[in-house]
Amino acid sequence: MAETTKIFESHLVKQALKDSVLKLNPVYMIKNPIMFVVEVGMLLALGLTIYPDLFHQESVSRLYVFSIFIILLLTLVFANFSEALAEGRGKAQANALRQTQTEMKARRIKQDGSYEMIDASDLKKGDIVRVETGEQIPNDGKVIKGLATVDESAITGESAPVIKESGGDFDNVIGGTSVASDWLEVEITSEPGHSFLDKMIGLVEGATRKKTPNEIALFTLLMTLTIIFLVVILTMYPLAKFLNFNLSIAMLIALAVCLIPTTIGGLLSAIGIAGMDRVTQFNILAKSGRSVETCGDVNVLILDKTGTITYGNRMADAFIPVKSSSFERLVKAAYESSIADDTPEGRSIVKLAYKQHIDLLQEVGEYIPFTAETRMSGVKFTTREVYKGAPNSMVKRVKEAGGHIPVDLDALVKGVSKKGGTPLVVLEDNEILGVIYLKDVIKDGLVERFRELREMGIETVMCTGDNELTAATIAKEAGVDRFVAECKPEDKINVIREEQAKGHIVAMTGDGTNDAPALAEANVGLAMNSGTMSAKEAANLIDLDSNPTKLMEVVLIGKQLLMTRGSLTTFSIANDIAKYFAILPAMFMAAMPAMNHLNIMHLHSPESAVLSALIFNALIIVLLIPIAMKGVKFKGASTQTILMKNMLVYGLGGMIVPFIGIKLIDLIIQLFV
């Protein structure tokens, strides 16, 4: 699922070519009125090729009319090819998912406690099944008994198994995943054909994809332009009669196709499908295309601190000795107290100790694990003891043993806390040696990412349960714009509503049942696949890898989708305007000599001008397919900067490219005339 599919893989291209021909069916083509106009023109050109006197006009060269027919046919095939290729990529992903839905048996538990083996497809909602090591979970369900590790790699692409148990936030299992160890009893929660995987396949294939509001608005604009250009073309016929100029039906057909926005009309559907495809490449399930587009309008991101901005594991950052001890002695004691500590904090202390270039000898001793009661861990050697733990617990231990508390210890502990860190006090026997500074580490690359989002006009808000001082320290280090300290789940809803009241589009992440109301309230809610079912139902995006930082990726994909559609629309309309001024002077120059002043391209003849424009019109669709599929590339910048850049590249470029392309094609046509 997480693998990236190349745009022009041979098997996808072959299937897309077949599908692009099948899509020529008028019943299908009428769904895209712009391209349907092209198909009507193609059929009229075919009719004029077979019956030159079809409209009782002066006969026109059959070769010329047939050339128009072929070019229009290729235009339709190319437009259909872009859509078929985008759909093919989705189907390829769906097939990969469908491979996990192999025929399997289920061990259903009967009311008397005995088992019966049945086909998984016969399971109904409410049935209870037992799944043991190496077996696949037959359908979506809820763990009601047992504890096991479950391999979800077939669905999420994540190789590390996850622990599932009854109760809490980790009792939901997905059909098609397998039990890696132990056993589970699962209550089926979905009917056959309506599982999470079935819905995922349907969404990836685009079967339930509907046009988004932005697509509908753009489509309305394109249809309006199409009608306007068709009216212009129809008025040309009586104008030509008045000027005693022979304007054939074939030329009118070709001219109409050249001027209506066929480029974006042929690529519009592919852009939308490809946008959904890019989201699935990140292992994110979008419930609708609208949710992806909404991401493009997001201007406020609400992010949890733990797991999203920070790694969530406190890491050793510094050793700070008290005045009565030495740095070397503190490092050795911290190392000894942590060498058998397999927690992330313990491993980070050992790693930091190695970096101090001090001789660290390992003695044999009895490891004392951390408990909630003692709040410390350490090692008992034959002649001494070494511990590390919470300041209060360590001070209490020393006092009870009649030891001495260093006068500067309190200042060291408070200093670490003010920086947003967690202090651990280290002692040897009953002597306090110093403090280990544990720091909640900011994830790599986030500072740059937040800067990029800020340049794009997106505000980041960090929500954390930490106190004001700790929250301020981490917010400053990470580079977020604002923070909400001592934030409870219900406070997130208030933050979302406040931002929405200002007219902002808000996105947030969550995974627990208590996050569900906020996920539903936000304009874009990204739920973790490892989270509760209520969170996943409330959200409109689900991250199969359960990585909260992906919300930023989805926002960028949404912006890229909107930019791609806008850029190619600008390019297409600019193309149409350029073709208008490139073709008309060449066509009417004989009847209206004054038009010669506008004939800056000096095309060979009216016929070659029309054919050149038609060929360019068809080829430009093919050339723009990679951009439609991959999206317009952009770097973090303000909306105004991006708009100006795209207007320059796709607006001005859309005006210049047709003049160059049509002239080159005209020169090639002259070689064969």
From Swiss-Prot:
Pfam families: E1-E2_ATPase, Hydrolase. SUPFAM superfamilies: Calcium ATPase, transduction domain A (SSF81653), Calcium ATPase, transmembrane domain M (SSF81665), HAD-like (SSF56784). It is a multi-pass membrane protein. The active site is at residue 304. InterPro entries: ATPase_P-typ_cyto_dom_N (IPR023299), ATPase_P-typ_P_site (IPR018303), ATPase_P-typ_TM_dom_sf (IPR023298), ATPase_P-typ_transduc_dom_A_sf (IPR008250), HAD-like_sf (IPR036412), HAD_sf (IPR023214), P-type_ATPase_bsu_IA (IPR006391), P_typ_ATPase (IPR001757). The keyword Cell membrane applies. Mg(2+) binds at residues 511, 515. The chain crosses the membrane at residues 34-54, 65-85, 216-236, 253-273, 581-601, 609-629, 649-669. Its main location: membrane. One of its GO terms (cellular component) is plasma membrane. One of its GO terms (molecular function) is P-type potassium transmembrane transporter activity. It is found in: Cell membrane. ATP binds at residues 341, 345, 370-377, 388. Its EC number is 7.2.2.6. Keywords: ATP-binding, Cell membrane, Ion transport, Magnesium, Membrane, Metal-binding, Nucleotide-binding, Phosphoprotein, Potassium, Potassium transport, Translocase, Transmembrane, Transmembrane helix, Transport. Gene3D superfamilies: Calcium-transporting ATPase, cytoplasmic domain N, Calcium-transporting ATPase, cytoplasmic transduction domain A, HAD superfamily/HAD-like. PANTHER family: POTASSIUM-TRANSPORTING ATPASE ATP-BINDING SUBUNIT. Belongs to the cation transport ATPase (P-type) (TC 3.A.3) family. Type IA subfamily. The system is composed of three essential subunits: KdpA, KdpB and KdpC. Part of the high-affinity ATP-driven potassium transport (or Kdp) system, which catalyzes the hydrolysis of ATP coupled with the electrogenic transport of potassium into the cytoplasm. This subunit is responsible for energy coupling to the transport system and for the release of the potassium ions to the cytoplasm. HAMAP family: KdpB. This is Potassium-transporting ATPase ATP-binding subunit. It comes from Staphylococcus haemolyticus (strain JCSC1435).
